[in-house]
Amino acid sequence: MALTFVMPGALREFSGGRGEVRVGGAAHTAGEALALLWAECPGARDRVMNERGEVRTHINIFIDGENIRHGGGLAAPVGDGAEIIILPAVSGGQAPS
């Protein structure tokens, strides 16, 4: 099974500048899929996960458009050929006047 990870700009330094990283291997859950990504792009792990092995609060992970926070967290199911988007939260700016 091949999975496609869509990497945000902030993580591309760990993916050799690639916006998409395709990984092969068996993954039935989000946690297993992320383990495959860490094998390919090990430096990205500390940016996405905290010291307790949880997804950082400012990071959202979507599997085929579904946020894993609402679908089982790291136990969320991953289908064959899934697209997994790692998306840091965006905040700041100024309210319109």
Language model features: what each stretch is:
Residues 1-97:
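Ubiquitin-like/PB1-type beta-grasp interaction modules and other compact soluble beta-rich domains
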